From Swiss-Prot:
GO cellular component, one term: cytoplasm
Identification of the protein by name: Imidazoleglycerol-phosphate dehydratase
Subcellular location: Cytoplasm
Catalytic activity: D-erythro-1-(imidazol-4-yl)glycerol 3-phosphate = 3-(imidazol-4-yl)-2-oxopropyl phosphate + H2O
Lineage of origin: Bacteria, Pseudomonadati, Pseudomonadota, Alphaproteobacteria, Hyphomicrobiales
Coiled-coil region list: none
PANTHER family registered for this protein in UniProt: IMIDAZOLEGLYCEROL-PHOSPHATE DEHYDRATASE, IMIDAZOLEGLYCEROL-PHOSPHATE DEHYDRATASE HIS7
The organism's place on the tree of life at top rank: Bacteria
Gene Ontology BP term (one): L-histidine biosynthetic process
Gene: hisB
Length: 195
């Protein structure tokens, strides 16, 4: 089974994450940040990953540490669940519409973490959530999952729709990239023989 559990404790947060890459989209999310919970529930549902995330964070300061550390731990869990990456599709991309918004997400499960993030918001907050934290989450996730991740919003107006588009796009493209390709016949999808 391609599952993993991660616990991460710092002076700022206490995070526990579990993931099943071959799940059905079940989510149990409790970060203390309502909008982040919503985005992570979308991630689980659209990726068809079973995900449990619990964060106790220093929300009396702000939502930054909670959001970033959730991304770190989720990325670590994905990397652990993938193991040696034998048989995976490795690459995937998607154009993800959300009403007036269209975002493009591309992934390479390369073992070379990198983020290109070309998404911007016209407002600083979605409810109480700082929109700059969307990038912080994606950065933390990509670096710790060991993936190359390109995120670009081609156009969009509504900040909620933009955020939802990139989170759903991450989920849908990751779902395709981690899928087992029977033609790989259990091989690592690289001429180097490892990722």
């Amino acid at each position: 089974m391609r599952t993993a559990s991660i616990s991460r404790r710092t002076a700022e947060t206490d995070v526990s994450v579990s993931i099943d890459l071959d799940g059905t989209g079940k989510a149990t999310i409790a970060t203390g940040v309502g909008f982040l919970d919503h985005m992570l529930e979308l991630f689980a549902r659209h990726g068809l990953f079973d995900v449990t995330i619990k964060v106790e964070g220093d929300l009396h300061v702000d939502q930054h540490h909670t959001t970033e550390d959730a991304g770190i731990a989720l990325g670590q869990a994905v990397a652990q669940a993938l193991g040696d990456k034998r048989g995976i599709a490795r690459y995937a991309d998607i154009h993800l519409p959300m009403d007036e918004t269209l975002s493009r997400i591309a992934i390479d499960i390369s073992g070379r973490p990198f983020l290109v993030f070309r998404t911007s918001f016209r407002v600083e907050k979605i409810g109480q959530f700082d929109t700059e934290l969307v990038r912080e989450f994606f950065q933390a996730f990509a670096m710790n999952a060991g993936i190359t991740l390109h995120v670009e919003t081609l156009y969009g107006e509504n900040a909620h729709h933009i955020a939802e588009s990139v989170f759903k796009g991450l989920a849908r493209s990751l779902r395709k990239a981690v899928a087992i390709d029977p033609r790989e016949d259990g091989r690592v999808p690289s001429t180097k023989g490892s990722l």
